[in-house]
Amino acid sequence: MIGVIDYGMGNLYSVSKALERVGVPYFVSEKPEELKEADAFILPGVGSFGDAMDNLGYTKLDQLIHDMVSEGRLLLGICLGMQLLFEESEENGTASGLGLLKGKAVRLKAEDEKGNKLKVPHMGWNRLSFHNESPLLTKTEQGYAYFVHSYYIDGMEENALLASADYGVRVPAVVGKRNVFGAQFHPEKSSTVGMSILTQFTKMAAEQKVKK
């Protein structure tokens, strides 16, 4: 069973519909005591990094996330939810993140190295390039994914980079280390690529449950 974490800033409808399409049992909750029953978790997110962390702290969901990850349960952050997995963000000053992965969310530049203008936010389809192997991407081909974001992760560990996209800079698109994973793009809006990642995540959670 997948627990979708509701902290007031996630695109819950789209994520829920995507999980239904791949036939995955799930529930949505803002209550730590209910979410503790999940086998794995999805942390969606849209909006401001600082506001998101404030909401997670106020609801004590930040502590739940740390506790569940420490127990070895799988976590998948989506869009802003992926950025929250890292140490901090420079959005509206500096805000601390969950610190589960090393790196910082910084603003996308409005031009590439050649001086060509780029629109920020980065919005639309972009091709993925794969880096390190992971069971999360076992069944996923290097296709296109749908992005909507103004910040990207910089300074992350290379061995945690699973896939990237190019938008004037290398944008970490899929990350993963141990039982913590993230997708900067929206899997629920990314057709075959997105559905494959969600399917693999749920398979990994099911396999982990069997091992226990």
Swiss-Prot record:
Catalytic residues, chain numbering: 79, 186, 188
Gene Ontology BP terms: L-histidine biosynthetic process
SS bond list: none
PROSITE patterns: GATASE_TYPE_1 (PS51273)
Keyword field contains NADP: no
Protein EC: 4.3.2.10, 3.5.1.2
Family matches, as CDD domains: GATase1_IGP_Synthase
Record field: catalytic activity: 5-[(5-phospho-1-deoxy-D-ribulos-1-ylimino)methylamino]-1-(5-phospho-beta-D-ribosyl)imidazole-4-carboxamide + L-glutamine = D-erythro-1-(imidazol-4-yl)glycerol 3-phosphate + 5-amino-1-(5-phospho-beta-D-ribosyl)imidazole-4-carboxamide + L-glutamate + H(+); L-glutamine + H2O = L-glutamate + NH4(+)
Membrane-crossing segments per the record: none
Record keywords, A-Z: Amino-acid biosynthesis, Cytoplasm, Glutamine amidotransferase, Histidine biosynthesis, Hydrolase, Lyase
Ranges for domain Glutamine amidotransferase type-1: 1-211
Database matches in Pfam families: GATase (PF00117)
Gene Ontology MF annotations: glutaminase activity; imidazoleglycerol-phosphate synthase activity; lyase activity
Biological or metabolic pathway of the protein: Amino-acid biosynthesis; L-histidine biosynthesis; L-histidine from 5-phospho-alpha-D-ribose 1-diphosphate: step 5/9
GO annotation, cellular component aspect: cytoplasm
Location in the cell: Cytoplasm
InterPro entries per UniProt: Class_I_gatase-like (IPR029062), GATASE (IPR017926), Imidazole-glycPsynth_HisH (IPR010139)
Chief location of this protein within or outside the cell: cytoplasm
Entries under NCBIfam families matching the protein: IMP_synth_hisH (TIGR01855)
Cross-referenced HAMAP family: HisH (MF_00278)
Quaternary structure note: Heterodimer of HisH and HisF.
Role of this protein: IGPS catalyzes the conversion of PRFAR and glutamine to IGP, AICAR and glutamate. The HisH subunit catalyzes the hydrolysis of glutamine to glutamate and ammonia as part of the synthesis of IGP and AICAR. The resulting ammonia molecule is channeled to the active site of HisF.
Protein name per UniProt: Imidazole glycerol phosphate synthase subunit HisH
The organism of origin for this protein: Bacillus subtilis (strain 168)
Encoding gene per record: hisH
